[in-house]
Amino acid sequence: MAKVLVLSGGLSEKEKSYSSQMLDLFVKTYKEVHPNDELEFVDLNTTKHAEVFLSRNTFATYWKDVESDKWIDKLKAADKVILSCSMTNFGPTAVVKNFIDSVAVANKTFSYKYSKKGDAVGLLDHLRVMIVTTQGAPKDWYLWGSHTNWLIGTWKFLGAKYVDTFELNGTKLSVFADKKPYDVVEEFRQDALEKAKQF
């Protein structure tokens, strides 16, 4: 039985949110494939990540105030992480960026002291990560602004041994204009099932 930490980082209300609907679909199919796994659900919008942000003014107390150690412990206790995030101004949502700020901590989730070549060594090397992302533009439309690639690189930096994505791109295109997010997402059920089997 695997322990799975499910992190929702969407910005919109659930019914209108492609990322929330994609997350729900992936989790539903994941449970079908892995019925004995234990899932813990967290909406990052209901945590300190929606209240306390890293800045010069908060630097001295940020990691304590945002409960960094609590979240790092959750990552260390989990076998898998499923994280959902929509693109916001060419990057991840603020709560997802803030979550990464709170857990990317030297000598806790990565370290340079074990490196032989000067590069960082990720300490979360037990984790398998599924990144569920959405964006209005087509895939790779903004090569300089891919929240998906940023998240892939970040989790690999932190040492995750497996990182995959379940993506919905182009939600602002005319092909989706007359459809509700739920109906659009349902078209990806088979993809979700295949991803869940591999994860």
Swiss-Prot record:
UniProt GO molecular function: electron transfer activity; FMN binding; oxidoreductase activity, acting on NAD(P)H as acceptor; oxidoreductase activity, acting on NAD(P)H, quinone or similar compound as acceptor
Presence of the UniProt keyword NAD in the record: yes
Record-linked InterPro entries: Flavodoxin_fold, Flavoprotein-like_sf, FMN-dep_NADH:Q_OxRdtase_AzoR1, NADH:quinone_OxRdtase_FMN_depd
UniProt enzyme class: oxidoreductase
Keyword Flavoprotein: yes
Domain of life, per lineage: Bacteria
Enzyme Commission number(s): 1.6.5.-, 1.7.1.17
Co-factor binding comment: Binds 1 FMN per subunit.
Residue numbers binding FMN: 17-19
Reaction equation(s) it catalyzes: 2 a quinone + NADH + H(+) = 2 a 1,4-benzosemiquinone + NAD(+); N,N-dimethyl-1,4-phenylenediamine + anthranilate + 2 NAD(+) = 2-(4-dimethylaminophenyl)diazenylbenzoate + 2 NADH + 2 H(+)
Names of required cofactors: FMN
Record keywords, A-Z: Flavoprotein, FMN, NAD, Oxidoreductase
Protein task: Quinone reductase that provides resistance to thiol-specific stress caused by electrophilic quinones.
PANTHER family, per database record: FMN-DEPENDENT NADH-AZOREDUCTASE 1 (PTHR43741), FMN-DEPENDENT NADH:QUINONE OXIDOREDUCTASE (PTHR43741:SF4)
Subunit note: Homodimer.
Record-stated family: Belongs to the azoreductase type 1 family.
UniProt xrefs under NCBIfam families: PRK01355.1
Designated name of the protein: FMN-dependent NADH:quinone oxidoreductase
Organism: Mycoplasmopsis synoviae (strain 53) (Mycoplasma synoviae)
